[in-house]
């Protein structure tokens, strides 16, 4: 190539009656620089491709949830495999909608989501059917954490009654029925984004169940005067309880324990009918090119020590029954360490919930929130 350029430059000199030795030297230097850059890229590109290949992409909620997984299972996974974990964060439904648009070429390799929204992924063909033989630690899962052939529980919590005992003299909550007491008028808050908990409770108190939720409609309508507000997110829930504006809440247990840690004097109870069980789940995305790594990640998630650490950090229930939990954590209301404790809770079928959520939200907004 150098010789060809020199020849061309020589021809130029002949044609135009001048000499281009300096031009030849300059062009030779430029050519050598280009060749060096070319060979550098040739070496760097495979390394970059390898770097990209050695990443596992995990979709999860942001904030403390992302940090929870990063500091526990992702840390263990990277130490064992050398593979870096990259996170995509966002809201539950936003992430679902993005994966629908990317169907067949998923943005992530692994997704964490709620048990019922997981069914929306599965019904749309977005999750792989799990090969549990590749997740040996899953043998220790609680039965209630085995959500479907496509997604399984990562940890659990409850929605239950949390209240400010300092603002409610001599008030006790031993049953969900206590929310209907006349003295509760204008004191209760619940989530505006998911009424499934109180809908299921109302059906049970009416002698039915979530599948036949209509039988609890009159019961739930009778609770309407006792609602003061409906919170839109965790921060709003915290503000309503901390200020005392709503001294009673249908509250996420993990959120309540966070507030207690911030100095808000909340009492959390498990009614005699049981609290409403919630399970966050994990799944492998269909079309992922890192499925084998994804299975290793999920297996690391179910390591007994990792599950115990998650329980400690979030004050939630480990999904596996062999985790050794700090006794101070294990005794907290809403933290379950035995199969019997799991079974004592109100467990709304996740597939039913996925099918009914839109209908429930519409009915609740029209009949209770307006």
Q: Residue spans of the language-model regions?
A:
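Bacterial N-terminal signal peptides
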Residues: 33-42
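Early extracytoplasmic/lumenal segment of secretory-pathway proteins
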Residues: 51-119
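Extracytoplasmic ligand-binding site segments that recognize negatively charged/polar headgroups
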Residues: 61-70, 107-245
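A ligand-binding cleft/hinge motif common to bilobed small-molecule-binding domains
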Residues: 117-122, 242, 247-265
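Periplasmic-binding protein-like
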Residues: 157, 218-223, 262-286
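A bilobed periplasmic-binding-protein/Venus flytrap-type ligand-binding module shared by bacterial periplasmic
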Residues: 160-167, 203-206, 278-291, 309
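Mature extracytoplasmic/periplasmic domains
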Residues: 285-345
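Conserved C-terminal helix/tail region of periplasmic/extracytoplasmic solute-binding proteins
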Residues: 340-370
